[in-house]
Every structure is written in structure tokens, then in C-alpha cells.
Amino acid sequence: MYQPLADRLRPNSIDEVVGQRHILGEQGVLRRIIQGGNIPNLIFYGPSGTGKTTVAEIAAAQMHRPFHRLNATTASLADIKAITADVGTLLAPEGVVLYLDEIQYFNKKQQQSLLEFMEDGRITLIASTTENPFFAVFGAVLSRSTVFEFKQITAEDALPAVER
């Protein structure tokens, strides 16, 4: 089966992630949260190609919960309800991790619909956006999430990955 190069080279651990030392370095807050395994709702923002999706996948793996990925440009509330259908069963007794890419494309009502699932623990939301979340994300979702900024990757950051 064909697998894109980016997926074949995607890091599997925090130590393999390129850049983002300010949050993933040895004393980085996000590193500590992920290593702790009890991950809150998170919002990642920054330019494309900075590792937001990769870090979300690594975080979800630490939680040992089912991981679902949706893109807000094409997803609907029905998709979210379908994902939460197995919560509480043997398939997902402790809830699921939902990675919602491009959350800024969900309108206010769609973002509000996430609250019920976030508050009762059916979903641990990890959302990403290229927009400033303080303008693009509904306030109630934002207040229930921890926000991290991902910065552009520099040539210096990329060198260790190229050498690998």
C-alpha cells in the first residue's frame, strides 16, 4: 500500500520532533504534559508544516485511547457523534482523543457542540489552527483548553532530522 513520504518519516516520539524546543525541549511544558499521560484539551496554532499533527498523534499514543482525526473543512457534528458512539464500551471505556485540524473552519455553533463531549470526558480535544486561536476559536472551547504556539522550523532545527 502506498504511504506518503511524510508519513513514512513522521516522528514517533517527542525526541524525534523537529523544532519546537520552546515547548518540547527537556524542560518544555508540553513535553511534561505528554510524558505525564494525563493530557488536557489542547489547541496548537502556528504555520503549516510545524509538527502540530505529529505532536497530536504522539500525545494520543501516550494516553492509550482511540485516536480519531477530522478536518474541520469537511467534518460535521454527525462525524463527532459517530466517534463518541463507542465511548463507555469496551472499545473506548475512557473516552477518545479527537484531533480536529483547522478548527477555525468550524462555525460557532459547531464549536459549541464540542463542549458537551469535552466536559463529560467523552472527547479529549486536540485541535490545530493556522489562525490566532484567541480570535478563531469560540471562547468556551478556548477556556477549556491549553494553548501552545508552534513556531516556523529553521534550517538549524531541521539539520538533525536530515542527518537521521
Where are these regions (language model features)?
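Conserved beta-strand position immediately N-terminal to the Walker
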Residues: 15, 42, 148
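Walker B beta-strand of ABC/ABC-like P-loop ATPase nucleotide-binding domains
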Residues: 98-100, 114
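Conserved AAA+ ATPase "SRH/arginine-finger" region at the nucleotide-binding site
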Residues: 71-73, 146-159
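A short, basic N-terminal segment
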Residues: 1-36
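Conserved catalytic/switch belt of AAA+ P-loop NTPases
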Residues: 31-35, 109-143
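Walker A/P-loop
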Residues: 1-3, 32-70, 85-88, 115-120
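Structural recognition of the conserved hydrophobic beta-strand(s) that form the central parallel beta-sheet
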Residues: 70, 99, 124-128, 149
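Short glycine-rich substrate-engagement loop in P-loop NTPases that contacts/grips substrate
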Residues: 23-27, 65-97, 108
